[in-house]
Regions:
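A short SAM/SAH-binding and catalytic strip from SAM-dependent methyltransferases
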Residues: 144-158
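Core SAM-dependent methyltransferase catalytic element
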Residues: 223-246
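Class I SAM-dependent methyltransferase Rossmann-like catalytic core
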Residues: 3, 17-80
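Conserved beta-strand signature within the Rossmann-like core of class I S-adenosyl-L-methionine
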Residues: 170-185
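Hydrophobic adenine-recognition pocket in adenosine-nucleotide-binding enzymes
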Residues: 151, 167, 180
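Short alpha-helix
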Residues: 196-222, 240
Length: 246
């Protein structure tokens, strides 16, 4: 199980007194070249930040947006849901607010940085940490639907061969996979420090071939209902979503 590493996402700006631009604004100083350099650097940072933010949100965040459409696709089967992936506490909290829905979560990474609401879910037994490269501590068909996000992208085929069948084992009505697009590579690189390993983003054709090779079948009925519901609301997911038969 890969440990989370502390990530400092904010960059400390130097004090204004130490910035050459401040002292160089005197009319007799050489302000124009320094000001130009400062503006260029600022523009570069803004462009880099935009490129990362626009290249795709996490697939776990996408799960929140997809819940209404998953309910349309699976109906009563959404009564007992297991989510597997990072930030599972947030997903479980959202699912528990839905009518007639019970939810549990498995966090593939350490929960040492969990906030108070997440720790409360852990104490109540709704969320647990587990290494998904090994068999999950649940009996067969313990859940009606299993949703996995931002977890399989970090597994090699060696471990996928064990993890995917096990996820299907604990679900009775379907397995839903949220996987990143290869075009999200730049955004996912930022998560390297968080998850401790490089991401392996695959194309839809790769996943489809893999499902066939491992004997996992597409849930055509759920796929059709999901796409119809999404189309009516003009919902376009930022991640690949696969519906599989358990």
């Amino acid at each position: 199980m890969a440990a989370r590493r502390a990530v400092n996402q904010s960059r400390r700006l130097p004090d204004s007194a130490s910035i050459p631009l401040v002292s160089s604004l005197h009319p007799k100083s050489r302000s124009t070249p320094l000001l130009s350099v400062g503006l260029v650097l600022l523009g570069a940072f803004l462009l880099i930040g935009y490129s990362y933010s626009s290249s795709g949100a996490s697939c776990t965040s996408e799960v929140h947006r997809a819940i209404p459409f998953l309910k349309k696709a699976y109906g009563q089967s959404m009564r007992k849901v297991l989510h597997v992936g990072p930030d599972t506490c947030a997903v479980v909290s959202t699912l528990l607010k839905e009518d007639d829905t019970e939810a549990w979560g498995v966090e593939p990474y350490d929960l040492e940085d969990a906030d108070s609401s997440c720790k409360r879910l852990i104490r109540k037994g709704f969320v647990r940490s587990a290494d998904i490269k090994f068999s999950l501590p649940y009996r067969p068909k313990s859940f009606s639907i299993v949703i996995v996000s931002d977890a399989l992208d970090y597994l090699s085929p060696k471990y996928l061969n064990k993890t995917l069948p096990d996820l299907a084992r604990v679900s009775s009505d379907g397995l839903v996979i949220f996987a990143g697009y290869p075009g999200q590579q730049r955004a996912k690189v930022l998560e390297l420090a968080k998850f401790g390993k490089p991401v392996k983003l695959r194309s839809s054709s790769w996943w489809i071939r893999y499902f066939v090779q491992t004997g996992l079948q597409e849930n055509a009925a759920a796929t059709k209902k999901f796409e119809q519901a999404a189309s009516k609301r003009s919902y376009k997911p930022s991640c690949q979503i696969f519906h599989l038969v358990s």
